């Protein structure tokens, strides 16, 4: 009985190719067809026919590729790759509403083991195990009947390819205008079609990565300090906090009805409620905000082999330190002193390879005590990174309940998810306030200042979208609206003649973005270079300091 059950089923080669082409093109593209139905109402016979033609085209293309691969005995291997890739893509699209593009591949490649583990759920294991791994095993397990004679088999397969091509041509002849209009007006659709989405996105990512060995482009070689910043007994110390996945919409400083910023509300900070990000993923936003390029002209390839903000600040003679708790600086700190404090795995601060952001302060007191000269300290936080929002804050910050204490966020209610996320913001409030108090405790030696800016926002199930990383052109504002604030000590305001009331007024009425960080940090630290743009320096209109 067992022997009979384990006996390998046998299919002819054409039947095998047709079966697995259908599975890949139709069964692993449910996410694609669901998205098509959102943009193509079936309110006419023509639209119904256009929709029906889509799986026909997908099947024809996959069948052509697998059949041609069969001539060089690669059909099984290629089918398995398509199945595994398609199953994974479909799961994440259906579960989190993501889009498979280059930035998503970059996110995946930058994902830490801890982040990968956080995504692992019973639903994910079961879904990928059945639709991906099991299907791939079956593709190898099914025995293909040897073709006799081979010439006839070859002719049959060529005929299959020709018929598939003919079907594509016929669909194009009848529905080209419909396809062109649909995909032109809904460019994100093609990024839901497997396995082409993963193939194109991976190739695009590789094309960018291979440029990493290009020679370094130096900028700001004329960098020097404003002489007025060097006068006086006190040195200058600035902390720049790079936030992670914090939404401007959830900061009470910006009008959010919940009190998510109780500490910062007492710190006399300048909050900028109308701030947008450069990208919707850390891999894009962090290199962009530390570059001299505005978002509209940002060149990701150039940014990977060009100096940035911290290189210029360091060249001007300021001590720079980057403390990281978010999986790396994406190139922004490559040429300045930096350390991954997550790897310290401090007791009480770290769980399963991830740490609370308070770990970023480990050793900072000692570093500041021994700091000779001016300094800039960058704290790269893990902030509100999902989907394990409940792991971002210690138990005492669980203020808003009930919470979503699972990584299967799609199974939580909207109330639970927002409560959990808002608790992460409450902890962000604590971290930024702690940094301000750290600076205050060293005001006997330093004139101090602080900037906080999140890298991007987050979707919390609005319109069925979760997490972040959607293409900028179609991403919701929740992924692009980010919190930014500046704190200036009284000493800084007086010493460098900055009118805080002026800043508060401008902050509440004007629009800002991550484009402002580069020149604002140069101005804040008194670094002069031809790359500095006064129009982008937030403090400049309210500053009376001059040579």
Curated annotation (Swiss-Prot):
Primary localization: membrane
Gene Ontology cellular component terms for the protein in this record: plasma membrane
Periplasmic compartment residues: 31-47, 101-123, 176-547
Localization terms from the record: Cell inner membrane
Record's keyword terms, sorted: Antibiotic resistance, Cell inner membrane, Cell membrane, Lipid A biosynthesis, Lipid biosynthesis, Lipid metabolism, Lipopolysaccharide biosynthesis, Membrane, Transferase, Transmembrane, Transmembrane helix
One Gene Ontology term of the molecular function aspect: phosphotransferase activity, phosphate group as acceptor
One BP term from GO: lipopolysaccharide core region biosynthetic process
Membrane topology: Multi-pass membrane protein
Entry EC number(s): 2.7.-.-
Segments on the Cytoplasmic face: 1-9, 69-79, 145-154
Keyword Zinc: no
EC class of the enzyme, as a word: transferase
Transmembrane segment boundaries: 10-30, 48-68, 80-100, 124-144, 155-175
Annotated metabolic or biological route of this protein: Bacterial outer membrane biogenesis; LPS lipid A biosynthesis
InterPro entries in the record: Alkaline_phosphatase_core_sf, EptA-like_N, PEA_transferase, Sulfatase_N
Induction: The eptA-basRS operon is positively autoregulated by BasR under high iron or aluminum concentration conditions.
Function: Catalyzes the addition of a phosphoethanolamine moiety to the lipid A. The phosphoethanolamine modification is required for resistance to polymyxin.
Name of the gene this protein is made from: eptA
Protein name from the UniProt record: Phosphoethanolamine transferase EptA
One Pfam family in the UniProt entry: Sulfatase
């Amino acid at each position: 009985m067992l022997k009979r059950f384990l006996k390998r089923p046998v299919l002819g080669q054409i039947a095998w190719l047709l079966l697995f082409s259908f599975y890949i093109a139709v069964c692993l593209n449910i996410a694609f067809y669901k998205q098509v139905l959102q943009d193509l109402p079936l309110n006419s016979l023509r639209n119904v026919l256009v929709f029906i033609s889509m799986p026909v085209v997908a099947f024809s293309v996959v069948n052509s590729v697998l059949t041609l691969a069969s001539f060089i005995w690669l059909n099984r291997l290629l089918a398995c790759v398509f199945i595994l890739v398609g199953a994974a893509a479909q799961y994440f699209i259906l579960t989190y509403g993501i889009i498979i593009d280059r930035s998503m591949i970059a996110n995946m490649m930058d994902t830490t083991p801890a982040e990968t583990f956080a995504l692992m759920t019973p639903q994910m294991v079961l879904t990928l195990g059945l639709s991906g791994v099991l299907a791939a095993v079956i593709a190898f397990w099914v025995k293909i009947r040897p073709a006799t004679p081979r010439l006839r088999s070859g002719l049959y397969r060529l005929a299959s390819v020709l018929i598939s091509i003919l079907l594509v041509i016929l669909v194009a002849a009848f529905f080209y205008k419909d396809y062109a209009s649909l995909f032109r007006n809904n460019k994100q659709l093609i990024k839901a079609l497997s396995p082409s989405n993963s193939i194109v996105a991976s190739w695009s990512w590789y094309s960018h990565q291979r440029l990493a060995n290009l020679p370094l482009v130096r900028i700001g070689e004329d960098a020097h300090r404003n002489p007025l910043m060097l006068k006086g007994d006190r040195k200058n110390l600035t902390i720049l906090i790079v936030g992670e996945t914090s939404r401007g919409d959830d900061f009470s400083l910006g009008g959010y009805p919940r009190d998510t910023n109780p500490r910062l509300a007492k710190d006399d900070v300048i909050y900028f409620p109308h701030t947008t990000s450069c990208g919707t993923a850390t891999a894009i936003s962090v290199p962009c905000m530390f570059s001299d390029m505005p978002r509209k002209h940002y060149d990701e390839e150039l940014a990977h082999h060009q100096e940035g903000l911290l290189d210029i600040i360091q060249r001007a003679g300021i001590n720079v330190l980057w403390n990281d708790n978010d999986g790396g600086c994406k190139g922004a700190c490559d040429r300045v002193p930096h350390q991954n404090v997550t790897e310290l795995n401090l007791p009480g601060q770290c769980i399963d390879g991830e740490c609370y952001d308070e770990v970023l302060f480990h050793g900072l007191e000692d570093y500041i005590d021994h700091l000779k000269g001016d300094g800039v300290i960058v704290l790269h936080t893990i902030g509100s990174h999902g989907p394990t929002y409940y792991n971002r804050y210690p138990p005492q910050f669980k203020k808003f309940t009930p919470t979503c204490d699972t990584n299967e966020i799609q199974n939580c209610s909207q109330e639970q998810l927002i409560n959990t996320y808002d608790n992460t913001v409450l902890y962000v409030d604590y971290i930024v306030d702690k940094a301000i108090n750290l600076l205050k405790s060293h005001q006997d030696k330093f004139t101090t200042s602080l900037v906080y800016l999140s890298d991007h926002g987050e979707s919390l199930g609005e319109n069925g979208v979760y997490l972040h990383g959607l293409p900028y052109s179609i991403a919701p504002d929740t992924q692009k609206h980010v919190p930014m604030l500046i704190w200036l000590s009284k000493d800084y305001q007086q010493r460098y003649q900055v009118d805080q009331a002026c800043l508060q007024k401008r902050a509440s009425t004007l629009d800002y973005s991550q484009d402002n960080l580069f020149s604002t940090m140069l101005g804040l630290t008194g670094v002069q270079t031809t790359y500095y743009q006064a129009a982008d320096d937030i403090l400049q209109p309210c500053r009376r300091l001059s040579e």
